[in-house]
Amino acid sequence: MYTRIISTGTYLPEKVLTNDELEKIVNTSDDWIRSRTGIESRHIAADGEFTSHLAEKAAYKALEAAGLVPADIDLIVVGTCTPDRMFPNVACLLQERMGITGPAFSLEAACSGFVYALTVADQFLCSGKSKRALVIGAETMSRLIDWTDRETCVLFGDGAGAVILEASDKPGLLYSDLGADGQHRKLLYTETGLSNMESSVEGHLKMKGNEVFKVAVRTLESICLLYTSPSPRD
């Protein structure tokens, strides 16, 4: 049994924050941001617009593109680290609004959240537990941003992307590899927590961008070499 992506959907909030506008907030410039990231602007969720709202709009676009209705879905998996609330999770909020039945849960894996969600959904379908999954990556990162920190505020925005993943007799989703390395936890994190009783601390995102980039490149390189087995000549 295989799985394949049969449609996609996206949603970006209406508000756009350009590099020129950021120049008025923090010590940066359009040239500095473009040369290091390629980013020209980012979208920002409106007041009262939450992660579940972004996810829902992307989900309906994916359904429309596939010619399906919510009742055709029997699994929802969402990757997000900016949920509306601790619980119910974003997937369950979508389930209630869209009238979908079956398993519904969210995964917290930061930047790799959608990849984790897609891989888990793939395993559900390959095992025969589900037939058609709605998989979403959605974030409202602007709620975590310190707009005086140019290491982070220039990089992140808000948005959602969704795919419909379907069981198939032919290969579609070919391969995925999940991993984590907790020793780098201080390279990208937020202080705010619940069980650690630090919920009163400002929850701004903190990141050592150069180090995150180095770790990501090394890890991706090693995975590619491991699973493609290139020759020395390659």
Describe the residue ranges of each PLM region.
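Condensing-enzyme catalytic core mediating Claisen C-C bond formation in acyl metabolism
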Residues: M1-D47, D149-K214, R218, S222
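Acidic, glycine-rich active-site loops and adjacent beta-strand->loop/helix elements
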Residues: Y11, G79-D84, A110-S112, G137-S142, ...
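Short, well-ordered amphipathic alpha-helical segments that serve as non-catalytic structural scaffolds
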Residues: S29, T51-A66, V90, A216-L226
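Conserved catalytic cysteine-centered active-site region
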Residues: R34-H53, T80-A133
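Flexible, glycine-rich active-site loops centered on histidine and acidic residues
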Residues: C126-A160
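Conserved small/polar residues in nucleotide/adenosyl-binding loops
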Residues: Y227-D234
